[in-house]
């Protein structure tokens, strides 16, 4: 059966280009009815180009159809908003008539648009959940460390510890300058940072520009004789040389329970020193930083200390939890960073990191670390791994038990969880928001397996849990939480439909057939495909109709095709309660709810769309055909329908 497709809507100045392509082309006149649009879009099994007049349709209606907006202009006029285009085509590409360049531009932008989908779900989760499972750097970037608990199983960075493997080299890309990268991976939950050796504040100001939110939530005490005055109210400059803990302690208010971080990046000038004197000085400076941090261990949650590898020592000792390479450092910079876990208050539970202690360092091993991971062409993924390792609490979400509201985004169907489907459904049942991959097309960028859509529908819907495909979830949040998910959101609806999303939300009252619930693009085609490939699948339905009875073809084909994910509980309530009303009452409920639809049969407006027995017969027939293969309980739904 075909997978979800996108409608690649181009404005008129691009319509001549798409005629040179090989995808189908859909010309819109502006005179189409709701049903015309629904039936016509349902005939396409691949992405399709479209052009013409769409000004009478709303953004939610067009997103429900899978529209992506492409133009050389900034905006497209729709019925309810002026939509910022999703893909802005450079005018030189439009003038060139180069179809490959045009389609490459669309493809590159669509990959970036995936982030908009994930960010929208995370924005909802940040409002509703405390615990976040399966987390990576994207979650840390927007989490509130004072409120949210971030769990996951991120990839390990290269670390030096006694008797431990360093790790193997991995592909990497360039990143920010070394010291900006340092602040980027170490600053997360700390509210007060004491930064010794801050220099001329250029690094701190670059970090402020890169991450203004994290910069603003920290009180910075910066220490350096050359540090200039700073106008930022959260930066306090101390023009002193730090040589003992006394220089730091007098600037700390111990009546405040805050998380503190100590950064030591001290390096004096070489001046006239010979090699031996210079190395001795450097070694002493690094050890002094460790000693000051360790002596103040009860005041700081952690410390990050400059660590230069001596040339003349095969082995030496330092106080450390981990040594690790520096993202953005030159390939010949034989200098690491020393992370020390200390005993001070922390918002993040870092008990899985060992306490800082005296550690023996073998010089050749840490030199190898530099050779494997340093270089101006490297550092982006190293920085990401360090950020995640230091600030994400390492726990498997499938095994974690807690009473806190939780979010489980983009990890449940990782290949490592194959065979754990019962646990996945249990997590989706108790999560505030969870995602699972259901797409059947080949996956090139992710290591996920697909859950069957019909099983997800039957397993995932409860009185207080909605189960929708990803596009339905975004449309639902646009409708119910317009302050969280804006109508102008840029995302790829076809990509989103490859996910099932569970939301801890009640059934809307009244239970209207909003776009988020009822789209079923291509349902008629799916039904015809079933008939022309295996007519026995429709025999019972045909016989019932000859007898003057009926079954719900919508429900039956939805389950048999495995092409859709929608919420059964809400759908059944919609059929039995809302559709049983007359036309006037139906329209009144839609208006009162501010709901929108993309399918409307005028001949059914005064009648129920189905009755209870139609739904029961559809489920029974699905059970008869697929019950031995279906992993979900169908009997529980039959029992529910008898009493709903």
Swiss-Prot record:
One protein family per Pfam: Orbi_VP4
Domain of life of the organism encoding this protein: Viruses
GO CC term, one of those recorded: viral outer capsid
Stored InterPro entries: Orbi_VP4, Orbi_VP4_C, SAM-dependent_MTases_sf
Main location: virion
CDD domains: capping_2-OMTase_Orbivirus
Keyword annotations: Capsid protein, Outer capsid protein, Virion
Localization terms from the record: Virion
Family: Belongs to the orbivirus VP4 family.
Function of the protein: The VP4 protein is one of the five proteins (with VP1, VP3, VP6 and VP7) which form the inner capsid of the virus.
Protein name per UniProt: Core protein VP4
Organism: Bluetongue virus 11 (isolate USA) (BTV 11)
């Amino acid at each position: 059966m075909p997978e979800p497709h996108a409608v690649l809507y181009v404005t008129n100045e691009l319509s001549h280009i798409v005629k040179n392509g090989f995808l189908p082309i859909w010309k819109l006149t502006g005179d189409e009815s709701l049903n015309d649009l629904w039936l016509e879009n349902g005939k396409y099994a691949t992405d399709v180009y479209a052009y013409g007049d769409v000004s009478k349709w709303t953004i939610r209606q067009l997103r429900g159809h899978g529209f992506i907006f492409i133009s050389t202009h900034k905006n497209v006029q729709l019925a309810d908003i002026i939509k910022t285009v999703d893909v802005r085509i450079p005018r030189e590409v439009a003038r060139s008539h180069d179809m490959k360049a045009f389609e490459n531009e669309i493809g590159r932008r669509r990959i970036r648009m995936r982030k908009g989908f994930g960010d929208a779900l995370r924005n909802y989760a940040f409002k509703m959940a405390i615990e976040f499972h399966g987390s990576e750097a994207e979650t840390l970037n927007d989490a509130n460390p004072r409120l949210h608990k971030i769990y996951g199983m991120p990839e390990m960075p290269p670390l030096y510890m006694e008797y431990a493997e360093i790790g193997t080299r991995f592909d990497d890309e360039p990143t920010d300058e070394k010291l900006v990268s340092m602040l980027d991976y170490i600053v997360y939950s700390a509210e007060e940072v004491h930064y010794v050796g801050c220099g001329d504040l250029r690094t701190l100001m670059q970090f402020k520009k890169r991450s203004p939110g994290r910069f603003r939530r920290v009180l910075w005490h910066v220490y350096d004789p050359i540090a200039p005055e700073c106008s930022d109210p959260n930066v306090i400059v101390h023009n002193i040389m730090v040589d003992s803990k006394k220089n730091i302690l007098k600037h700390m208010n111990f009546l405040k329970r805050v998380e503190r971080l100590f950064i030591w990046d001290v390096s004096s000038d070489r001046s006239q020193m010979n090699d031996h004197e210079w190395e001795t000085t450097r070694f002493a400076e690094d050890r002094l930083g460790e000693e000051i941090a360790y002596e103040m261990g009860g005041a700081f949650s952690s410390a990050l200390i400059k660590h230069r590898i001596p040339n003349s020592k095969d082995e030496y000792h330092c106080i450390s939890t981990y040594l690790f390479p520096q993202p953005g450092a030159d390939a010949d910079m034989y200098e690491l960073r020393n992370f020390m876990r200390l005993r001070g208050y922390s918002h993040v539970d870092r008990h899985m990191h060992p306490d800082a202690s005296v550690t023996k360092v073998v010089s050749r091993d840490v030199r190898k670390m530099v050779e494997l991971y340093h270089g101006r062409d490297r550092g982006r993924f190293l920085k990401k791994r360090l950020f995640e390792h230091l600030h994400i609490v390492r726990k498997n979400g499938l095994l974690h038990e807690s009473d806190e509201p939780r979010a489980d985004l983009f990890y449940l169907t990782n290949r490592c969880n194959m065979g754990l489907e019962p646990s996945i459904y249990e997590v989706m049942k108790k999560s505030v928001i969870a995602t699972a991959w259901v797409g059947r097309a080949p996956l090139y960028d992710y290591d996920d397996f697909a859950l069957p859509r019909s099983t997800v529908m039957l397993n995932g819907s409860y009185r207080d849990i909605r189960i929708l495909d990803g596009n339905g979830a975004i449309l639902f949040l646009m409708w119910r939480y317009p302050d969280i998910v804006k109508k102008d959101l840029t995302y790829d609806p076809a990509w989103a439909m490859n996910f099932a999303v569970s939301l801890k939300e009640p059934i809307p009252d009244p239970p209207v057939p909003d776009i988020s619930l009822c789209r079923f693009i291509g349902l008629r085609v799916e039904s015809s495909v079933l008939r022309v490939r295996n007519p026995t699948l429709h025999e019972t339905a045909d016989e019932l109709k000859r007898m003057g009875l009926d079954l719900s073809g919508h429900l039956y084909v939805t389950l048999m095709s495995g092409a859709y994910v929608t919420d059964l509980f809400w759908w059944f309530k919609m059929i039995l309660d809302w559709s049983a009303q007359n036309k006037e009452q139906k329209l009144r409920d839609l208006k009162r709810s501010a709901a929108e639809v993309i399918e409307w049969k005028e001949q059914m407006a005064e009648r129920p769309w189905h009755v209870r027995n139609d739904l029961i017969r559809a489920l029974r027939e699905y059970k008869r055909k697929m019950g031995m293969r279906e992993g979900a309980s169908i009997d529980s739904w039959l029992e529910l329908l008898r009493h709903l």
